[in-house]
Amino acid sequence: MTRLFGTDGVRGLANEVLTAPLALKLGAAAAHVLTAEKRVDGRRPVAIVGRDPRVSGEMLAAALSAGMASQGVDVIRVGVIPTPAVAFLTDDYGADMGVMISASHNPMPDNGIKFFSAGGHKLPDHVEDEIERVMDSLPAEGPTGHGVGRVIEEATDAQDRYLEHLKEAVPTSLEGIKIVVDAANGAASVVAPKAYEAAGATVIAIHNKPDSYNINMDCGSTHIDQVQAAVLKHGADLGLAHDGDADRCLAVDKDGNLIDGDQIMAMLAIAMKENGELRKNTLVGTVMSNLGLKIAMDEAGITLRTTKVGDRYVLEDLNAGGFSLGGEQSGHIVLPDHGTTGDGTLTGLSIMARMAETGKSLGELAQAMTVLPQVLINVPVSDKSTIVSHPSVVAAIAEAEAELGSTGRVLLRASGTEELFRVMVEAGDKEQARRIAGRLSAVVAEV
């Protein structure tokens, strides 16, 4: 049986794969698993539910809320708000669980559900497996009378609580910094511009008018050309691009050059080391982190640890080792002292704080590492499980690694959220990386 949970919750085409009946069952099962030990002395467990603006969000929120209420859980709806805000609010409200309804950077027709435990932590695999296990075994009857959970619509102070949290996390004045922010017509459309303005920056917001259908449509972190053009048009000091649920952030310098998550991590790691804030002088990245990040961290006397792709795995390593900075090339940056998950708005504030504190431009700060040419090709496949062990793929990888030697690397991995296999090649020059990646992708496509 195919596992329901992927690397970032449950995700699929809304109303076909991710249906209201499935959301109802998920809500009930998650409530049962996550709140079973909280029902003492008649106490009623509490859940926080947020969503991004896509059209199917209300439908799924209603179904999820009904499922949780059927298990005796009070549900507090916090409306359209970023994923990291739901994680924060789960802890801030003292709730027993949190739920975010979003498919992140995926197209509008998709949607997803991700759960947080008490304290705002993403769930480990074994807890997700337990939720799946009990989905079809819960009795149809639940609590009755006073035992039924309530649904509290749209908590009025949720956004203000989150904004105050961001202000406390990064108190540096950003006065004099001019920024373009692309909110992807998503969950950060209101919050991100407000947070940057509150810190003193001059903000030009684009793609910040969601209409339920335009989330991620030719905008946001997957269409970086939009913020690049806007930065050049407005003469801004930098641009920031968020994804649909605003747990990631990519940046653009004043000349329109992309600054990815690896470069952001490099500049923040060096700054935190200088300030004595980089615990154990260690940064946590993933297997997709550019080889240039490893080289830069070695030169700075910082240890780079790598995990599987997915900010949940970065988080697990951060928590297990007691480290203070981690993230992904895609722009998920995690600062455990200020949050339990990747937070695009917090990342944006941290980048600008570093600019304000040093007086340097983003382009200058990004020189903390040299990005080696990297080519990534997504190959549609029908069965991700057989690719890496197929003899023709094994032979093609060996041939590529022999050609690259110590000047590059090859990584093949299955997407955790889509029916894709990702082929990544780093090399001394772009053309070599492109040629080898194309060759490998052709082999994968034929399997």
From Swiss-Prot:
Q: Which UniProt keywords apply?
A: Isomerase, Magnesium, Metal-binding, Phosphoprotein
Q: Where does Mg(2+) bind?
A: 104, 243, 245, 247
Q: Looking at the record's lineage, which domain of life comes first?
A: Bacteria
Q: Entry cofactor note text?
A: Binds 1 Mg(2+) ion per subunit.
What is annotated as the active site? Answer: 104
Q: Which reaction does it catalyse?
A: alpha-D-glucosamine 1-phosphate = D-glucosamine 6-phosphate
EC annotation from Swiss-Prot or TrEMBL = 5.4.2.10
Report the Gene3D superfamilies cross-referenced here: Alpha-D-Glucose-1,6-Bisphosphate, subunit A, domain 3, Alpha-D-phosphohexomutase, C-terminal domain
UniProt modification remark: Activated by phosphorylation.
* Molecular function in Gene Ontology: magnesium ion binding; phosphoglucosamine mutase activity; phosphomannomutase activity
Enzyme class (EC, first level): isomerase
Phosphoserine found at: 104
- Which PROSITE patterns did the record assign? PGM_PMM (PS00710)
Q: What are the GO cellular component annotations?
A: cytosol
Q: Which GO terms describe its biological process?
A: carbohydrate metabolic process; peptidoglycan biosynthetic process; UDP-N-acetylglucosamine biosynthetic process
Cofactor dependence? Mg(2+)
Give a Pfam family name: PGM_PMM_III
Role according to the record: Catalyzes the conversion of glucosamine-6-phosphate to glucosamine-1-phosphate.
Q: Which family does it belong to?
A: Belongs to the phosphohexose mutase family.
Instruction: Tell me which PANTHER family the record gives.
Output: PHOSPHOGLUCOMUTASE (ALPHA-D-GLUCOSE-1,6-BISPHOSPHATE-DEPENDENT) (PTHR42946:SF1), PHOSPHOHEXOSE MUTASE (PTHR42946)
Q: What is this protein called?
A: Phosphoglucosamine mutase
> To which species is this protein native?
Corynebacterium glutamicum (strain R)
Cite the source lineage: Bacteria, Bacillati, Actinomycetota, Actinomycetes, Mycobacteriales
> What gene does the UniProt entry assign to this protein?
glmM
